[in-house]
């Protein structure tokens, strides 16, 4: 059995969980999420906790046990607290703007790069116009959106210019050695 999968998931106040076979629906103060879990795993609700258990002892059931427990736990945390990723834009003249549901990046290309935020995800500016905060209730969508924004101009190893996650360490390389 999975060490992670064995742990019961506590349900906080103001969060309701509806189980319908393999479908799990979670409602909370920030919104609601639905997900269909893979086969070979059963989800049961006992008092104020949710328990995920494998159907049998097969390899696929054991593989999916911890996965399903983490997916449900992420849904509960998302509707109660939400998720956010912070990105830093480093480079001379590099900046970002948020207009409604659209993020515009000026990162050294001839034209600005415009990105439409998916449903349920919001982009906001940090203290400076070189910080972008991407937030939402679905951890997977927030992470994918942040990765797509970072992929527009990933940090390069020589000068460190580009878009990076806040606190991300970039391995730097030495430049070409000059001629003697």
UniProtKB/Swiss-Prot annotation:
The gene is rplF. Keywords: Ribonucleoprotein, Ribosomal protein, RNA-binding, rRNA-binding. Belongs to the universal ribosomal protein uL6 family. Disulfide bonds: none annotated. One of its GO terms (cellular component) is cytosolic large ribosomal subunit. It comes from Picosynechococcus sp. (strain ATCC 27264 / PCC 7002 / PR-6) (Agmenellum quadruplicatum). This protein binds to the 23S rRNA, and is important in its secondary structure. It is located near the subunit interface in the base of the L7/L12 stalk, and near the tRNA binding site of the peptidyltransferase center. One of its GO terms (biological process) is cytoplasmic translation. Gene3D superfamilies: Ribosomal protein L6, alpha-beta domain. One of its GO terms (molecular function) is rRNA binding. This is Large ribosomal subunit protein uL6. Part of the 50S ribosomal subunit. Pfam families: Ribosomal_L6.
């Amino acid at each position: 059995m999975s060490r992670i999968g064995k742990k019961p998931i506590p349900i906080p106040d103001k969060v309701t969980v509806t189980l319908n076979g393999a479908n799990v629906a979670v409602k909370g103060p920030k919104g609601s999420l639905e997900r269909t879990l893979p086969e070979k795993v059963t989800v049961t609700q006992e008092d104020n906790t949710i328990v995920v258990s494998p159907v049998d002892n097969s390899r696929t059931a054991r593989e999916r046990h911890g996965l399903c427990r983490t997916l449900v736990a992420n849904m509960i945390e998302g509707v109660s607290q939400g998720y956010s990723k912070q990105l830093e834009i480093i480079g001379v003249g590099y900046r970002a703007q948020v207009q409604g549901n659209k993020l515009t990046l000026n990162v050294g290309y001839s034209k600005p790069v415009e990105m439409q935020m998916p449903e349920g995800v919001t982009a906001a500016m940090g203290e400076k116009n070189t910080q972008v905060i991407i937030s939402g209730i679905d951890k997977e969508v927030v992470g994918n959106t942040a990765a797509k924004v970072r992929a527009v101009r990933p940090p390069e190893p020589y000068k460190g210019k580009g878009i990076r996650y806040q606190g991300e360490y970039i391995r730097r390389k030495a430049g070409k050695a000059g001629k003697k």
